[in-house]
Amino acid sequence: MAVVAMSTTQSAKAEKRPSMELPAFRADSALVLVPVNVVDRRGAIVNGLARNAFLLTEDGVEQQIRSFSEEDAPVSMGIVLDLSGSMKRSLGAAKQALRALIEDANPGDEAFLNAVSTRPRAYSGFTRDFDEILHRVAFENAAGSTALIDALYDSLKELRAGVHPRKALLVISDGMDNHSRYTSKELRELAVESDAQIYTIAPGDASAMAPFGKAMALSQQRQGLQFLDELAARTGGIAFVVRDQKELAKAVVSIGHALRNQYTIGYVPHSDGRKAEWRRIKVKVAGSGLRAYARAGYRPD
């Protein structure tokens, strides 16, 4: 399971190129563009790396990198806030984290907010008025069951309407679900076919999530964290597990840094000639303690 420590962004030695509206992910017959985040062993975002620091493979075959850039581009972002009963003791910290995210947003960013408990609820469509988002959740309480999969499914579809090519879904939740109509399989399929990166933040203290028995809470926590981690890994996002309010706020700031310090790697697929419905992408980065986060693959047109 990918558990990332909280830290600040590492300074760039290389100069960034001017901001450009690059696609978050694109795969066609000519070029595949893959967004990549790099973190060090402390969890700090690393920028300023050169093209030759990266190795990319598709279905195990090394690919020649044809284009390479590092851009700070605007983001169309969806936020899903879990307001179910299992988040009751973490709700105050979750609201603080949401505020930290909003305050870290760039002027060109846009975001919508969906909440979830027994059913998904749309709190705000795409807006640049982030104060409106904060106002809508200021007096909300946590209660009820959790239709998390439904909320994520609906939010991924809503993200398609975002004006910016770069798209991300931020999920503040413990990962538990007990009231959804969609299945986890349906959500995974939609996630890998979308062009959005999913970033998740989950409280790591079982006692803060469930008052009805520590053993059951630990078991459900483990399943929820695995579910969130898989969604993040498949889409090139990062899953954060936090244990107190301070770490939660830092996680949101780290996600903001990740969104604004991405590399985009482009390549023309060269494989062994097999016709594959699913093509696996693997990105590695040179450097002690560095790790690259990229989506797990794509389905060719």
Predicted regions and their residues:
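Scaffold/interface architecture of coatomer-like assemblies
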Residues: A5-D301
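Sec-dependent N-terminal signal peptides
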Residues: M1-A2
